[in-house]
Amino acid sequence: MSALAQNETIAHQIKQQGGVEAYLHAQQEKGLLRFLTCGSVDDGKSTLIGRLLHDTRQIYEDQLSTLQNDSKRIGTQGEKLDLALLVDGLAAEREQGITIDVAYRYFSTEKRKFIIADTPGHEQYTRNMATGASTCDLSILLIDARKGVQEQTRRHSFISTLLGIRHLVVAVNKMDLMEYRQEVFNQIKQDYMNFAGQLPTNLDVHFVPISALDGDNIVTISRNMDWYEGPTLLDILETVDVKKEASKQLLRFPVQYVSRPDLDFRGYSGTLSSGILRKGQKVKVMPSGICSQVERIVTFDGDLDFAVPGEAITVVLKDEIDISRGDLLISADDEMMVTRHALVDVVWMSEQPLVQGQNLDIKVAGKKSRGKVENIQYQVDITHLTQRVAVDLPLNAIGSVEFSFEEPLMLDSYQQNSDTGGIILVDRLTNVTVGAGLVREIQTDVYEGPKEFSEFELELNRLIRRHFPHWGARDLLGGK
């Protein structure tokens, strides 16, 4: 493919659409798929992304020229273009020939827009992989045809499903090195399905044999594998149905900001997480439980009659209510649990292990609070998907942890709602993110409000929390 042809792709699409504005409007109307590539070390993840960008004409002339020079200088593919260099951006990655950080790339076809997360294969960078997977709808699991299903393949499959990804594409790469033999592909497919029986049952799994280096079954059907009658990888990406039924879920609107541009306007800004919010709808403010009615739904482009999940809006209520960042708007007839305790699946990202009794700052749906590790139930053995007793969680470990919270929180399970069920764990001294939490189970007892304390008790509590924060004393007033 010539550089000129690649360079003219967008210009040709603009001409077809009838101008720049029409082209931009068409781009906005396209559906978006977020997916990640993951697998074991050197399975060809970066090469696959480079091939997708190359064969869908997303590489410009200057990029191609740089790629040709870099391929000759530090490439690993001989006379061929080393497409992995398109996405391995860090100097350390290029020198070692591996992926360390999560590299994001963007491209589009006539049917869909895509955001790709190229995630690390090395076990010590599993935390980076979990970060990349948290916003994706689909995982491409690369398997080296020479090696078959590896431990990292199982690890990444488990993390993907743990983070709510239900669409998996198992791409058996480097088929060219195995002479494109069908029995190799079939054996790997069988081995993976044997393992996948331990994963959630509602998965949509596709298998495709590919060669990322030569482009077999990436964008065009391979002539070297006539025995494969399925779609290409790009066909799967363009047609997979990843529509989340967020609009059919319960209403969840986390308040991120109170908007007061003047004395006559008071609105509550944020992104609608799930459900449909309509003008005139009765809503309940959590955790106070006060009900009101939606008077306006304000956006940059004007008022709306209703809002759908993913839209950034400002809600104006009929009544003057004390609402602050971290509060939640739900349907008036919804009974949402407010709790101080939850069972959380934790992906630990710090070199210092997570231990029982540890205090952490937490963030959930715009709300900042504090939590304490009451008990570590178990650590997951990713290789065999079994549970083992643990007194701590080391770096890159995944385990089930019982948390208590300083104040009552509004939580859903992560599988129901990733916004109100996802917790960011932050070290209280360094302010560094040390883990990701996914709410598995909410304690059934409902918080009934703060008990009465004397003025002396309240003043002593404030004094201790102000001057001795490392003691981890909770706010007796529940954060109010």
From Swiss-Prot:
> EC?
2.7.7.4
Signal peptide (from-to): none
* Sequence positions that bind GTP: 39-46, 118-122, 173-176
G5 as annotated region, ranges: 211-213
Q: Give positions of region: G4.
A: 173-176
**Tagged with keyword Phosphoprotein:** no
Task: List each copy of the tr-type G domain by range.
Answer: 30-248
Report which reactions are catalysed by this protein.
sulfate + ATP + H(+) = adenosine 5'-phosphosulfate + diphosphate
Short name of one Pfam family: GTP-eEF1A_C
State the residue spans of region: G2.
97-101
G3, as annotated region: 118-121
Top-tier EC class: transferase
Keywords linked to the UniProt accession = ATP-binding, GTP-binding, Nucleotide-binding, Nucleotidyltransferase, Transferase
Does this UniProt record's set of keywords contain GTP-binding?
Answer: yes
Family to which the UniProt record says this protein belongs: Belongs to the TRAFAC class translation factor GTPase superfamily. Classic translation factor GTPase family. CysN/NodQ subfamily.
What is the protein's given name? Sulfate adenylyltransferase subunit 1
To which species is this protein native? Photorhabdus laumondii subsp. laumondii (strain DSM 15139 / CIP 105565 / TT01) (Photorhabdus luminescens subsp. laumondii)
